[in-house]
Amino acid sequence: LFPLMTVGGVDTHQRAEDSTKRVFILTRSFFAGQQRYGANTWSGDVASSWESLRNQVPLCLNHTLTGNPNVNTDIGGFFAGAYNRAWGDNSAVSNPQFRELYTRWMQFGLFNPMMRSHGTDVYRELYYYGQPGEPVYDALVGAVKMRYRLLPYIYSTAYNVSVGDGSFMRALFMDFKDDKNTWDNNRQFMFGPSLLVCPVVDPLFTEEKIVRTDETSGWNKVGNDAVGGWPAVDWTQDKTYDVYLPAGADWYDYWTNEKYTGGHSISAPAPISHSPLFVKAGSILPMGEDMQYSGEKPWELVTLNLYPGADAEFTLYEDEGDNYNYLDGKFTLIPMRWNDRRRELTIDAVKGAFDGMPAERTFRVTTPDGKSRDVKYTGKRVTVKM
C-alpha cells in the first residue's frame, strides 16, 4: 500500500504546484491501483546479461497483466562492469559482447511503454558505439529513430489505455486465446493492436557472457576474463531467429513486407540492424516523421501503412502534448476504417479540437505491394481507393 500512497501524494501535490505540465513519475515500487496516476514502473537495477534480458520480457508482461500498463527496463541492464577490462575504464563500449547485448536490449526497449537507456559502469550515449555507417551504431540509432516515428501509433494506443482499459504490451494469449501455442509464450508479445514483437534475447554474434555476483561485494559484478584486444566480429553476417506467428491471422514482416500465414513457427531474419517484427494483416499503422524529440514537428505528415488481408480500424488521437487540457475535452480523434473487399480507406471527419492543431495535414497511404498515395486532409471525411 505504501507505494500507492507515495505515488498518489507526488501526483496530487505536483499538480497543485503546476497544473500546466503533466506529472511524470518513474518508480520501482508498485501496488495495485497505481495505474490511476500514470506512474511508470521499471524493473529495477538488473544485471547486464542475456539472462536478465530474457527475464525482462515475462516480467513486463506479468506486470501489465496485473492491470498496470506502464512498465519499462534499464536498456542494456544497469550493472555492466563485468564487460570492462578494468574497474571503471568504460572499455565495454568496445566489447562486442556488451555491444550486442546493448543493441538487442535497445531493440526490445523500443517496444516498451517507456523507452529508457540507463545504467552504470559503461557509458550509454550512442556516439560511444561507433560512427554512422558502422553496423552497431546504425542499429542503435535506427531503434531510437523508429521510436519517434511510431509516436502517432504509441500516443493513440496510450489514449486507448486511458479510456478503453487497454495495454501497451500484450501477452499473446490476450489476443489469440484460442491458439494454445500462445499460452506459455513468454518471449513474444503484441505492442498495441497491430505489432507482433519478437525480441532477440540470445546472442547471435558473440558468446554469451555469464555474469555472476560476488557475495562479498553485492552489486559489483565479477567474472570478466577479457585480456588484450576484443575479438573481431563481423556484424554484417546474416542471422535468423525462431518466431511463432499466432494462428487466426496472417502476418507481414515489417522489414520486408513478406506475408505469412499464422499458426506456425518460422526462422525470421535477425541481422544486428533489427529484431524480427511483424504486423497483423488487417492493420492501419500510423507513423510520423524523423524527429529528435517528441514536440519537434507537428503531425502534418503522417504515413498510414495499410496491411490488407482483413478489415481494419484505427483512431488517431492527438492533443496539446504536455498539459491537462485534454481532461476538458481539448483533443482530437480521427477514426479510420479499411474495407478489405473494396480496397478502400475511409478517414472520417475529425472530432474535437485543441489549440495549435494542424489546420490541414497530409496522410501518406501505403500498402505492402509498394503503392503510395498522398491525401490532403482538412478535417473532412475522405475515402481513398488503393
Per-region residue spans from a language model:
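Solvent-exposed, conformationally flexible loop/turn segments
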Residues: 236-238, 263, 377-386
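Catalytic-domain carbohydrate-binding cleft regions of carbohydrate-active enzymes
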Residues: 1-274, 279-280
